[in-house]
């Protein structure tokens, strides 16, 4: 495929990249949750701790506070200690989960920005599409920016239009 033919299909290339990035952005929360579940296996330990706390509370309900105060107090302290340990464990896991989601989001947006910058760089002086100039007469210079081709649609305008159209199309799915 020659360079001229590649430039002829630039509008489709940009549209597909924008569509792909927006679909990935919609799927990003699900992907982040999946990755955090894969990277964190602490939920089993937490459920075991919860089960132990439940067992101790059940045992505590069978102990008479008046007759066996020492045993009751010991068991109550043990429950409180285990509950505090569980709370700190959950806080640490939640913080790690937020960090994982943040890193995945930042990585995605950096890659998306790099992709858009590379598209702008490649098609900076070439119009992505050429339409009759009377179709865009009042805004022809703005739409053609940065190419300065009469009737041309510049890469920046095309990316904005593609983003808006794809966002409208994907809105029901997000």
From Swiss-Prot:
The chain crosses the membrane at residues 9-29, 100-120, 149-169. Residues 30-99, 170-174 are cytoplasmic. It is found in: Endoplasmic reticulum membrane. Residues 1-8, 121-148 are lumenal. This is Guided entry of tail-anchored proteins factor 1. It is a multi-pass membrane protein. Keywords: Coiled coil, Endoplasmic reticulum, Membrane, Transmembrane, Transmembrane helix. Residues 39-94 form a coiled coil. InterPro entries: Get1, Helix_hairpin_bin_sf. GO terms for cellular component: endoplasmic reticulum membrane; GET complex. Belongs to the WRB/GET1 family. One of its GO terms (molecular function) is protein-membrane adaptor activity. Required for the post-translational delivery of tail-anchored (TA) proteins to the endoplasmic reticulum. Together with CAMLG/GET2, acts as a membrane receptor for soluble GET3/TRC40, which recognizes and selectively binds the transmembrane domain of TA proteins in the cytosol. Required to ensure correct topology and ER insertion of CAMLG. It comes from the Eukaryota. Residues 39-97 are annotated as: Interaction with GET3/TRC40. The lineage of its organism: Eukaryota, Metazoa, Chordata, Craniata, Vertebrata. Component of the Golgi to ER traffic (GET) complex, which is composed of GET1/WRB, CAMLG/GET2 and GET3. Within the complex, GET1 and CAMLG form a heterotetramer which is stabilized by phosphatidylinositol binding and which binds to the GET3 homodimer. Interacts with CAMLG (via C-terminus). GET3 shows a higher affinity for CAMLG than for GET1. Its main location: endoplasmic reticulum.
